């Protein structure tokens, strides 16, 4: 089973090109003004064009209202929505039907009990994303450069499709894949030289680290 790789929080043509050339299956644009990775729909639309036919364009939002989402979907024409806030199962279902787009629902993980939150979303969200629970007082639900105990994911049913996120970088991706066998990975701050500033060299290094990890004889989840 091929590994899905999402580079998230892209803001420049150079970073998008590096992600696509490296083999990203998904590229993410963040629409959340409090984030240093925030981008306007118009700017994202210009960058998104390069991904057509090459990667899944993901619009990442945090408890966005219908008006904001209408503008994002109309302008950017994403292939998928990622909901990274406190959206309820009913909200996820509503947005799937409103925009006729698949939805990836993000969850913040710190301890085993946090995984129980996904139960009401099964059969509604198309995919899950597991990120580290943000530090106390943080206004950002993701992109904080911290990881969680990957061993917790061993309790997941084998049929759950998800992306692993939170503190991934070229130095730890092999261990993350070995411990989780994750079907997908999501990286943002791990390929930045400063918050919100993607570094082409770090993106290239990350893809090389993934390739090296994939060459190792471990079994990925079926």
Swiss-Prot record:
It holds the Pfam family PRAI. Keywords: Amino-acid biosynthesis, Aromatic amino acid biosynthesis, Isomerase, Tryptophan biosynthesis. One of its GO terms (biological process) is L-tryptophan biosynthetic process. GO terms for molecular function: phosphoribosylanthranilate isomerase activity. It catalyses: N-(5-phospho-beta-D-ribosyl)anthranilate = 1-(2-carboxyphenylamino)-1-deoxy-D-ribulose 5-phosphate. Pathway: Amino-acid biosynthesis; L-tryptophan biosynthesis; L-tryptophan from chorismate: step 3/5. Its EC number is 5.3.1.24. CDD domains: PRAI (cd00405). It comes from the Bacteria. Gene3D superfamilies: Aldolase class I. Belongs to the TrpF family. This is N-(5'-phosphoribosyl)anthranilate isomerase. It comes from Brucella canis (strain ATCC 23365 / NCTC 10854 / RM-666).
């Amino acid at each position: 089973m091929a590994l899905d790789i999402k580079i998230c929080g892209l803001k420049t043509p150079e970073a998008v090109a590096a992600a696509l050339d490296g083999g990203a299956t998904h590229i993410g644009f963040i629409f959340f003004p409090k984030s240093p990775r925030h981008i306007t729909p118009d700017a994202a639309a210009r960058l998104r064009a390069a991904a057509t036919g090459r990667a899944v364009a993901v619009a990442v939002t945090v408890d966005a209202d219908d008006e904001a989402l209408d503008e994002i979907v109309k302008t950017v024409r994403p292939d998928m929505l990622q909901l990274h806030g406190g959206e309820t199962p009913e909200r996820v279902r509503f947005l799937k039907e409103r925009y006729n787009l698949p939805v990836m629902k993000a969850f913040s993980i710190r301890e085993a009990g946090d995984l129980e939150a996904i139960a009401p979303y099964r059969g509604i969200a198309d995919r899950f994303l597991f990120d580290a629970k943000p530090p106390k007082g943080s206004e950002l639900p993701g992109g904080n450069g911290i990881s969680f105990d990957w061993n917790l994911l061993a309790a997941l049913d084998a049929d759950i499709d998800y992306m692993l996120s939170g503190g991934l970088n070229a130095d730890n991706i092999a261990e993350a894949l070995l411990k989780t066998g994750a079907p997908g990975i999501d990286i943002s701050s791990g390929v930045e030289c400063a918050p919100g500033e993607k570094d082409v060299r770090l993106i290239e290094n990350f893809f090389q680290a993934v390739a090296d990890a994939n060459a190792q004889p471990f079994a990925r989840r079926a």
